């Protein structure tokens, strides 16, 4: 891939160099004077046929790419006024790119360490991950990795398995599940988890708490998938549009938002777990106090997500202002906890649940701030 920065070069000899290759560009290009700087190849803009602008390609680059006269190259205009030039055959499609890696863990590594290594390869964008086991590996290691891959990796399948090797293939196309859709799904699950977690806390519902914990695993799967998407998009900017983003800078926004949603789901899970630790039904007055803090928290999260979806800076600022009241309400309930004469175990559980509500409001603020950043970007001038 070659990033082409359009500038005017004082290179009259270019037009006389028969070895150069010419590509027709039916678009307007800004140019400026300059000389060859570092790895930047400068070429003079020319016109052929009275209508098409042309610019010659560096001969070395053409040879490196194995191109010849008549081959097709793809030219993609970027928001930073540059062009990205890619040989047509090398354009990623979001399908299996054939990228393959082999993991050969040493004997002393435990299964969690091996899983972290495999996960790192998944996040790096490899489509086929081969895990070769040492002779001393126990059979349960294969089972552990197989189940973990199915649980954690979106669209993955175990395509081959033996006592010596396990092969995981990632079949999902980035275009099938673009980043905005992933965020939308994570948002929906996180909101439901928070509502159910609060209901579980107020009503001491162990079955509901277990369901919330199960949903957290789904949020984690989507989080890992979007990190994989964003990593590949940063490495290969031709994927930006394919994963549903309009600007390379959106990768940072979606990285922050996805992490915030993953942490919100984690804290909703904490609230659900704390509800299982409460020994007796909470006093109605305490339930009312908790409801005040939780209602504001839910509202802050929902407003932040709406602001992100609509690039609404006004709503985002409203959400940030409301988030400050969550801390006040939560601290107010904590200060009163001793008056309800709960058991020590129940007191600790309620306090930790209130702390999680505070953390959720803070992560919701992060989402709102990203919405404001997107709003500014939509209105900026080039």
Can you say where each PLM-predicted feature lies in the sequence?
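Acidic, Ala/Val/Gly-enriched low-complexity intrinsically disordered segments
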Residues: 9-12, 19, 23-24, 31
């Amino acid at each position: 891939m070659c990033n082409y920065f359009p500038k005017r070069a004082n290179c009259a000899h270019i037009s006389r160099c028969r070895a150069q290759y010419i590509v027709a560009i039916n678009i307007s290009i800004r140019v400026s004077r300059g000389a060859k700087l570092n790895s930047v190849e400068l070429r003079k803009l020319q016109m052929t046929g009275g209508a098409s602008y042309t610019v010659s390609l560096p001969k070395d680059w053409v040879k490196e790419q194995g191109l010849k006269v008549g081959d097709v190259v793809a030219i993609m205009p970027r928001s930073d006024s540059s062009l990205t030039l890619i040989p047509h055959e090398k354009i990623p499609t979001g399908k299996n790119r054939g990228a393959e890696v082999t993991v050969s863990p040493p004997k002393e590594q435990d299964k969690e360490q091996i899983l972290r290594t495999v996960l790192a390869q998944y996040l790096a964008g490899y489509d086929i991950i081969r895990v070769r086991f040492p002779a001393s590996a126990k059979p349960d290691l294969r089972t552990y990795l197989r189940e973990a891959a199915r649980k954690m990796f979106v669209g993955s399948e175990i395509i081959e398995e033996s006592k010596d090797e396990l092969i995981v293939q990632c079949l999902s196309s980035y275009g099938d599940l673009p980043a905005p859709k992933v965020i939308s799904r994570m948002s929906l699950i996180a909101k439901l988890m928070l509502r159910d977690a609060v209901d579980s806390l107020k009503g001491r519902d162990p079955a509901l708490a277990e369901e919330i914990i199960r949903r957290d695993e789904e949020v984690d799967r989507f989080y890992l998938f979007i990190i994989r998407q964003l990593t590949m998009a940063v490495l290969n900017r031709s994927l930006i549009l394919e994963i549903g983003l309009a600007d390379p800078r959106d990768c940072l926004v979606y990285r922050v938002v996805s992490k915030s949603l993953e942490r919100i789901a984690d804290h909703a899970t904490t609230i659900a777990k704390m509800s299982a630790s409460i020994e007796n039904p909470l006093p109605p007055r305490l339930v009312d106090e908790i409801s005040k803090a939780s209602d504001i928290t839910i509202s802050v999260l929902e407003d932040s997500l709406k602001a992100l979806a609509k690039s609404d800076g006004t709503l985002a600022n409203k959400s940030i202002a409301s988030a400050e009241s969550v801390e006040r309400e939560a601290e107010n309930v904590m200060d009163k906890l001793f008056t309800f004469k709960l058991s020590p175990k129940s007191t600790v559980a309620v306090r930790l649940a209130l702390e999680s509500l505070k953390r959720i409001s803070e992560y919701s603020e992060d989402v709102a701030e990203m919405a404001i950043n997107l709003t500014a970007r939509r209105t900026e001038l080039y």
